[in-house]
């Protein structure tokens, strides 16, 4: 405190001296010699600011000089994307600190430090930062993904893991997954548009497939087609939720509390959407399961994940609201991110026909005519490498879901202030040329040859963290990886995928990001030429 007070006095004296000189009634008649002192003061003011900043914050990670009230917001802007933060790490090092209004943001861009944040010091950095919009969409942390680290998170994670995220669940539902995927293949084979030169945008059909997979697991419910009114309503609600939550438009009010009143209209729009969205989930799905369970009484058997979750609620472990926020998490975290990765994978396969052929050859050689199933995916290393390479090059959550330290913490010898937002630049870890050969290339072989071989000898490769690791890692990895592998295998074995006539030889894989997410900027138009069975 004494040091800060002394710095403030020095700075005040400097400013007062400058003001006195410039406001003097004789200032208009300054001689050159009289101007020397004010010019000198003006010249050294930036250095005084830097000195004061470095003295008062000597143990904080390095970072650009911040301004009062705004911090670094005016310098870096709203879009704190993975590429900008990677570029800044080249200047400020593997861990640096940004001041965004009233909030601290620590950025980690090194595998060893990622290990510290996510694993070794996983408890210290295991919480989640607050956000004015995500507070609305999570009911102030009543969910599992964005809640703070503690007893509520442990309870929600346990309740969600049993019906969704275990090997037993994967084996239980894998036949259903394949059934939904085979319907996609059937529709593509029988739809004339898929094989025409102009191709089709496959995203909507894959979206229906993923919604059916997750809604059958969650509610034992299925959408009949892309024109099903409930499917249209569900996707519309979730799309609007993603748009509002991922937008950068509300950052100014989140970073600077003084400006928050100007967000009133935006936040009201979020509240209105969330109320209607949760009512939709409750009225059409959750209450339906409650009625079925009540009608069956003691004879009821657990059919789907929601039955298990309602059981937990009826036993007093979680509230009615918690039930709905579990549904919220699955709709966003499990469906949308997997869909983005499928789009990236298909685009890269179209742009790399050699990879398609290698997958096809591997499946034919290894399985000798047997179909690809979840149970034999482990026998197909090149297919698995293709999934890994897709997630490496196009990490769907490039900065992972942000972490937070509830108390002051140490990292790499630096002090991380209490309640700092801490992000790990997982995209840069997986695309830094210091650690990866030609990282901009889509080359699955890297995971079966030189780079993958070295990584395979360690338990966790902290250069490659598309799902995070440790306590707050994404539990959906156990579903996403086999689903991605099966979809790729079924498409490659049934079709030669090529670019549409208007595509000029390549699919555009430009990216578009939001607060956390990364997805392909333009949905791919693909020609599916059926392979004779």
From Swiss-Prot:
Its main location: membrane. PROSITE patterns: CYTOCHROME_P450. Keywords: Heme, Iron, Membrane, Metal-binding, Monooxygenase, Oxidoreductase, Transmembrane, Transmembrane helix. It is an enzyme of class 1 (oxidoreductase). Its cofactor is heme. The chain crosses the membrane at residues 4-24, 35-55. Induction: Up-regulated by methyl jasmonate (MeJA). It is found in: Membrane. Gene3D superfamilies: Cytochrome P450. Heme binds at residue 474. It comes from the Eukaryota. One of its GO terms (cellular component) is membrane. GO terms for molecular function: heme binding; iron ion binding; monooxygenase activity; oxidoreductase activity, acting on paired donors, with incorporation or reduction of molecular oxygen. It is a multi-pass membrane protein. Its EC number is 1.14.-.-. PANTHER family: OS02G0467000 PROTEIN, TRANS-CINNAMATE 4-MONOOXYGENASE. Belongs to the cytochrome P450 family. Probable heme-thiolate monooxygenase. This is Cytochrome P450 CYP73A100. It comes from Panax ginseng. The lineage of its organism: Eukaryota, Viridiplantae, Streptophyta, Embryophyta, Tracheophyta.
